[in-house]
Amino acid sequence: MEKMHITNQEHDAFVKSHPNGDLLQLTKWAETKKLTGWYARRIAVGRDGEVQGVAQLLFKKVPKLPYTLCYISRGFVVDYSNKEALNALLDSAKEIAKAEKAYAIKIDPDVEVDKGTDALQNLKALGFKHKGFKEGLSKDYIQPRMTMITPIDKNDDELLNSFERRNRSKVRLALKRGTTVERSDREGLKTFAELMKITGERDGFLTRDISYFENIYDALHEDGDAELFLVKLDPKENIAKVNQELNELHAEIAKWQQKMETSEKQAKKAQNMINDAQNKIAKNEDLKRDLEALEKEHPEGIYLSGALLMFAGSKSYYLYGASSNEFRDFLPNHHMQYTMMKYAREHGATTYDFGGTDNDPDKDSEHYGLWAFKKVWGTYLSEKIGEFDYILNQPLYQLIEQVKPRLTKAKIKISRKLKRK
């Protein structure tokens, strides 16, 4: 096994084709981290000219100290049963990490627990310290240890039927409601950033500046690994739909009124149907007024939600999502999610990753809402083997490990204060 010098394109091709590859190991992802003070180095190992393992090493300076952390996010990208390749990757990583004065090498492989026996054993044998099997969104991890993934390698009907029944009904309703899902461009990031600001204010979290999203889009869109989707509501088109539905409801009432006059047996049923139709008419009249007001203010329509969809080979990722507070009954997020899944499938993806979660948290948990949303999309829990640290400077490592929990508690307090506002 030997060190190899490969191009960025060769690195990315290996990551995208490997079962343990991940978005965070793409070279263009490293470009997005520069804004937050990270810089990258890359390594590759192989035999007879054939690459057998790669890793993208991210480095960040420790504040006020001449040291760095070496972080291999969702790496190494290698077959973890291949001890020789794994050992060669560690040797290469150590060489660079020491040159960059790293106090530790942190990895969190994209390897699931039920397939991770070799990885656990071989990493520990090499001297890695396992950080344990904590909850998926534990503050002790950089990346979530658990994510929710929908298999999307199926036709439209099979995909829809994989969703939980109630969610399936919501998706069907969203498709009828009259929103339009657009694959947008860089200009659309302005709208997305505005929607993200609204979402942050509603849900009580700090949001990123538009430059952050532009950075991701600029780095990854050219290779087809980042797409922006926006959901639009056209008032004129939907007023026409509401008028049509009102006409149908009035016709239905007339039909049941006629049946009441001709059949006493059907009188009770007819009255119930008439009452139901009248309730629907009242709701549609309210909706029509709202849409007419919207048409006066925004005749071109408004955007209700948006999301960034990412790719790494056969894996797709719902990275960021945002939504308006208006017209939520149109279920724009349901329309968008289903559309993005189909788009991802049509562009070679077999899985759709909703991102981090805990495993079936209690209803009073701050993470319950995430779990409840993600579990209805035909997802399974992807439980990773977690984080591992290879310690290069034991005294500094111990000091930082002692300080980190205090910093985490401070961040949690700030987050909770924001949510209470």
From Swiss-Prot:
The keyword Cell membrane does not apply. The keyword Ribonucleoprotein does not apply. Keywords: Acyltransferase, Antibiotic resistance, Cell shape, Cell wall biogenesis/degradation, Cytoplasm, Peptidoglycan synthesis, Transferase. It catalyses: beta-D-GlcNAc-(1->4)-Mur2Ac(oyl-L-Ala-D-isoglutaminyl-L-Lys-D-Ala-D-Ala)-di-trans,octa-cis-undecaprenyl diphosphate + glycyl-tRNA(Gly) = beta-D-GlcNAc-(1->4)-Mur2Ac(oyl-L-Ala-D-isoglutaminyl-L-Lys-(N(6)-Gly)-D-Ala-D-Ala)-di-trans,octa-cis-undecaprenyl diphosphate + tRNA(Gly) + H(+). Transmembrane segments: none annotated. Disulfide bonds: none annotated. PROSITE patterns: FEMABX (PS51191). GO terms for cellular component: cytoplasm. It comes from the Bacteria. GO terms for biological process: cell wall organization; peptidoglycan biosynthetic process; regulation of cell shape; response to antibiotic. Its main location: cytoplasm. Pfam families: FemAB. Its EC number is 2.3.2.16. SUPFAM superfamilies: Acyl-CoA N-acyltransferases (Nat). GO terms for molecular function: aminoacyltransferase activity. It is found in: Cytoplasm. PANTHER family: LIPID II:GLYCINE GLYCYLTRANSFERASE. Belongs to the FemABX family. Catalyzes the incorporation of the first glycine of the pentaglycine interpeptide bridge, which is characteristic of the S.aureus peptidoglycan. This glycine is added to the epsilon-amino group of the L-lysine of the membrane-bound lipid II intermediate (GlcNAc-(beta-1,4)-N-acetylmuramic acid(-L-Ala-D-iGln-L-Lys-D-Ala-D-Ala)-pyrophosphoryl-undecaprenol), using glycyl-tRNA(Gly) as donor, in a ribosome-independent mechanism. Involved in methicillin resistance. Monomer. This is Lipid II:glycine glycyltransferase. The lineage of its organism: Bacteria, Bacillati, Bacillota, Bacilli, Bacillales.
